[in-house]
From Swiss-Prot:
Record-listed E.C. numbers: 2.7.11.32, 2.7.4.27
Catalytic activity, as annotated: N(tele)-phospho-L-histidyl/L-threonyl-[pyruvate, phosphate dikinase] + ADP = N(tele)-phospho-L-histidyl/O-phospho-L-threonyl-[pyruvate, phosphate dikinase] + AMP + H(+); N(tele)-phospho-L-histidyl/O-phospho-L-threonyl-[pyruvate, phosphate dikinase] + phosphate + H(+) = N(tele)-phospho-L-histidyl/L-threonyl-[pyruvate, phosphate dikinase] + diphosphate
InterPro entries: Kinase-pyrophosphorylase (IPR005177), PPDK_reg (IPR026565)
Pfam families, alphabetized: Kinase-PPPase
Name under which the protein is recorded: Putative pyruvate, phosphate dikinase regulatory protein
Domain of life: Bacteria
Function: Bifunctional serine/threonine kinase and phosphorylase involved in the regulation of the pyruvate, phosphate dikinase (PPDK) by catalyzing its phosphorylation/dephosphorylation.
Signal sequence region: none
Keywords carried by this UniProt record: Kinase, Nucleotide-binding, Serine/threonine-protein kinase, Transferase
Length: 273
């Protein structure tokens, strides 16, 4: 017999990509660390036949059902089948949409994937992603002034994943490594437009991450001091000094997720929101 205290099935049914549901489901599941959610994601469910196949899967692995289905008939079928199976279900967006309708005094469009319209904002994200990929790890330093954000930091401070996350929000982001003894490009030091932010982490954390990175490679490829905590501490001291000298804010990413780091960066300049 399945032990719900250890794990549970989480069924995510969407008529679009399922991204909204996945984010909501994971945010809720993260509050229950003693139980592991086994995710079952069903995107692009838009007709009765597809839905019935999904509900058969739910019947075979009972658990929590979350859904975002704008078609009222299909949503009603989910509620009905969940009652028959004996599992709880929640329409994630309905309470929010109803609140909006009540406050704004107008009905919603009830359109699948309405947040994924290929509008100006969509193309701005594509442009930001292209810019960010072209300016990863110090590439094309001559046009740093075209960036919204430039991240600087020693190796393994999550510069690249944070840059990509910001780019997905339409924020053009470049990043460049800080290496003691290697001067930063003049174009960066003279840039006036971008928000320049330094990323740091504890020497212990960086040593652990770097040790994982060198697995399968030779230590000499990275340098003998790459994972040495004392050497890393000196790198961090240099990075802090460099950022202080240029009045660049510092963010410690030791205990931050990529999302939390990105939120802290955006908070430094509200116009990025």
């Amino acid at each position: 017999m399945e032990n719900r205290k250890n794990y549970f099935h989480l069924h995510l049914i969407s008529d679009s990509t399922g991204e909204t549901l996945i984010a909501a489901g994971r945010a809720a599941a993260a509050q229950f660390q003693s139980s592991h959610a086994l995710e079952h994601v069903y995107p692009l469910i838009r007709n009765r036949k597809q839905l019935m196949q999904v509900m058969d899967a739910v019947d075979g692995a009972p658990g929590i059902v979350l859904y975002t289905i704008v078609d009222r008939e299909l949503a009603g079928l989910i509620d009905q089948r969940c009652r028959e199976i004996g599992v709880p279900c929640v329409s994630v967006l309905d309470p929010i949409i109803e609140l909006f309708q009540s406050y704004l005094g107008s009905p919603s469009r009830r359109r699948s994937g309405a947040q994924h319209v290929m509008d100006a904002e969509y193309f701005a994200r594509i442009e930001a992603l292209n810019f960010t990929m072209d300016h990863d790890d110090g590439q094309v330093p001559s046009d740093f002034n075209e960036a919204d954000v430039v991240l600087v930091g020693v190796s393994r401070t999550s510069k690249t994943p944070t840059s990509i996350y910001l780019a997905n929000r339409g924020i053009k982001t470049a990043n460049i490594p800080i290496v003691p003894g290697v001067p930063l490009p003049d174009a960066l030091l003279k840039a006036t437009k971008p928000l320049i932010v330094g990323l740091i982490a504890s020497a212990e954390r960086l040593s652990q991450v770097r040790q994982h990175r060198v697995l399968g490679t030779t230590q000499s490829f990275h340098g003998e001091d790459y994972t040495d905590r004392a050497a890393i501490a000196e790198e961090l001291k240099y990075a802090r000094s460099l950022c202080a000298r240029n009045n660049w804010p510092l963010i410690d990413v030791t205990r931050r997720s990529i999302e939390e780091t990105a939120a802290a960066i955006v908070a430094l300049r509200p116009r990025l929101r």
